Amino acid sequence: MGSKIVEKKRKSRDSDSESDNELGDGLFDGVLSQSEDEEDYIPSSEVDEDDDDDADESASEDSDDSNDSEDDEVEEDDEALLSDEIPSEGESEKDQDLAESKESKQDQDKEPSEPEILEPFVDPPRKEDEELEDRNYRIEKDANGGIRYVYDEIDPVYDSDDTDYNVPVNTIGNIPLSFYDSYPHIGYDINGKKIMRPATGDALQNLLDSIEVPEGWTGLTDPNTGKPLNLSRDELELIRKVQQGLIPDDVEDPYPDTVEWFTSVEEKMPLSAAPEPKRRFIPSKNEAKQIMKLVRAIREGRILPYKPPEEREREELEKEEEFYDLWQNEEPQPPNPMHIPAPKLPPPGYDLSYNPPPEYLPTKEEREEWEKMDPEDREKDYLPTKYDSLRKVPAWGNFVKERFERCMDLYLAPRVRKNRLNIDPNSLLPKLPSPDELKPFPTVQQTIFRGHEGRVRSVAIDPTGVALATGGDDGTVRVWELLTGRQVWSVKLNGDEAVNTVRWRPTKDTFILAAAAGEDIFLMIPTHPSVTPALDQASRDILNAGFGHATNGKQQANLPPGKEPPGKWARPGTRLEDEGVLLRITVRSTIKAISWHRRGDHFATVSPSGQRSSVAIHTLSKHLTQIPFRKLNGLAQTASFHPLRPLFFVATQRSIRCYDLQKLELVKIVQPGAKWISSFDVHPGGDNLVVGSYDKRLLWHDLDLSNRPYKTMRFHTEAIRAVRFHKGGLPLFADASDDGSLQIFHGKVPNDQLENPTIVPVKMLKGHKVVNKLGVLDIDWHPREPWCVSAGADGTARLWM
């Protein structure tokens, strides 16, 4: 026994030295999370102590049993079998092994054996001691004095199915160990015995333990037992395999043998080498019978071996015509929750009946008129027809066309499901003041001015507010008394050209009217009861002052040779001079608009058909005509001077450009967003602009805010021809449209720039008739009163008060 103890101690020392070498690299970070329960590890010192105790017990038992005979041992075994404790199957097998070992011992005692060489002072080993060491149970006495077999605890291996193996030794459960700080023990084992707190060494002992690292040392403490937490050899081997990228499980073979499921040897010889049977070389009797049937049918004419040429051609044509089924491979699809059914066709009316009422049948004139119309302009694609009976109704000729158009509509027009909101429409409208609170503004028609033949293209009220000038397609300019509607003066300027525009000079010290007919601009002094001799003489002096000015000669001298001047200033002729027309200016293209400067010495004309000379500025005191633009982007539509500053606005089809006449530079480009601008007007304050367009929109621009429209209004169903602000200080402006109506607006511009303008539509005036899709062509305001005058395509001008 002493030799065994010495050997065990040597082995423990050798293992300590090996553990030092294995843990020399110290690569164990995070390995504890993969290790098994700490309670399964038993220190080597405890194993040695258990072995020593077992050795001492076995030695004492051997000494006691040596005095008994073999018969006594047999009797003891019989008594053990007759005791209360019945051994299990494993125990009975072990008893049989003991009996067989005893029989073998008796046989060996009978046979002569060689003498064993024994060490001096050492007792010879006894076979009974070896057998007792191999037993896994011990014999104890129970409470009745009988024999009781107590087996050692089973140590399950890794592959065991014992689920209680991983249960920790400390059975206190999920309770913090801090509850046991005041007790000498730290819990209870499975048998209910206290687990005493292990002794802790001092700092020096801890330092020595950290230097002399045992095998499996981790430096951690098991919280359940309070003992050092070390790793076993199997856990160290598992860590090594994980670090080296090997398979941790020893059961699985990383390199299994290849299983050849199919042979790789090519078999060239047949599986059967029997000769071919004779029946394969003899014609078939059954096939011969079938062939003879076909031969008889051909002889009798029941089967034609060759088809007739007509039938073959017909079959070839049928083969060339290939028909495809569009829905052959169509797969059924589940119903889509977002599916929107197609709208249903409207039900047929009385006019689609085969026997409609007589009032639905068209007359001969209506039929001819319907046939002459274009298909796009027809209200219906068919004419009602009467038949005597339903069987006489022919097939519908436009059926395929109608179905095709419906399919195209369904295909090209996507259907959208609109979610309707339960919102009061009145809550979405801005809160505007009542129109009754915004009076005065024109509400009724006061006077109708008749006399022109054809359309009245332009109207203008003089600065004093007593005379009204109109120009029309008949080439005449007429002057009326505003309140009475009486015509007081008329002159025919041109028999071939219409008078496109008339405008008064904006000063009260003169009574000068400018009118444009074709390529000529006429400046005249009409006869009116309000014109005094002094006012008439002052007007003539202003018109005649430019004839003797030297600037006209310089203008002619500065022109290159062979080039005509942009404007020719001359007398209109004796006939027109006698009627009051004193001056004529001829330009290169037809004039559509005239705009005066606020001081009355300059006015601008616009000729949309002219390229470079579309915009011209004329100086009345010098008889000078100038072309300010060498190149203009787009076709000019109209122009206007700023009411307060030296700014000049020019409107093209899509934009309005603002130029500084002093600095001669472009200041701003206003983008209304309209397709075609028809007219515009500048607010008397100079910071706002209103634009009318042929696409039925009226746009308000705040020049200080942005170059985009501040507000867009759509109140007309046709194009807007003219817009005009009230120049007398009233917050009113109006527009004229081809639908025959005028829309009056209240547009208040506050002095505080932080406030937005207030725009309220207050009245729609209707009175003009629409002729050839033309309605109201021009509009002008009274200089002081809330009155306006409109010119219409019906040949009348109307005063609204």
UniProtKB/Swiss-Prot annotation:
The keyword Acyltransferase does not apply. One of its GO terms (cellular component) is PeBoW complex. One of its GO terms (biological process) is maturation of LSU-rRNA from tricistronic rRNA transcript (SSU-rRNA, 5.8S rRNA, LSU-rRNA). Residues 1-135, 358-377, 546-570 are annotated as: Disordered. It is found in: Nucleus, Nucleolus; Nucleus, Nucleoplasm. SMART domains: BOP1NT, WD40. Gene3D superfamilies: YVTN repeat-like/Quinoprotein amine dehydrogenase (2.130.10.10). Keywords: Coiled coil, Nucleus, Repeat, Ribosome biogenesis, rRNA processing, WD repeat. Residues 91-113, 124-135, 362-377 have a biased composition (Basic and acidic residues). Residues 35-90 have a biased composition (Acidic residues). Changing R486E: Disrupts the interaction with YTM1. WD repeats lie at residues 451-490, 494-534, 586-628, 631-669, 672-711, 715-755, 771-801. Its main location: nucleus. GO terms for molecular function: ribonucleoprotein complex binding. Changing R486A: Weakens, but does not disrupt the interaction with YTM1. Belongs to the WD repeat BOP1/ERB1 family. Component of the NOP7 complex, which is required for maturation of the 25S and 5.8S ribosomal RNAs and formation of the 60S ribosome. Component of the NOP7 complex, composed of ERB1, NOP7 and YTM1. The complex is held together by ERB1, which interacts with NOP7 via its N-terminal domain and with YTM1 via a high-affinity interaction between the seven-bladed beta-propeller domains of the 2 proteins. The NOP7 complex associates with the 66S pre-ribosome. This is Ribosome biogenesis protein ERB1. It comes from Chaetomium thermophilum (strain DSM 1495 / CBS 144.50 / IMI 039719). The lineage of its organism: Eukaryota, Fungi, Dikarya, Ascomycota, Pezizomycotina. The gene is ERB1.
